[in-house]
């Protein structure tokens, strides 16, 4: 269910339906802690267009990206995660986190502007795909 809360231990995640990538795509707002500091992650569940020139699916993707961008902003998200490691930089960020020294910034913490930018770019990709349809 859209907006469903899922409690895992001491943390509660909020799940949102964000169809587009697939009809059942779910994106999540996740409260986090890193070295005692609180953060909020926006986990975008549907990064890729895997459906060809399908107007209804691309429109759903666009609406979902636009909506989740607003949800992430309201939640104060400052960490951006993707369901594909190539799209959130995890291939380089994971080793950096493992080797991080005291006082070094967590590379996953991109700030509210970084989260907004990521979700704006995926939305703009959907809009460009729509514009390219005949």
Regions found by a protein language model. Give the residues of each.
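Metallo-beta-lactamase
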Residues: 3-8, 12-116
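C-terminal capping/extension segments of zinc metalloprotease domains
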Residues: 113-134
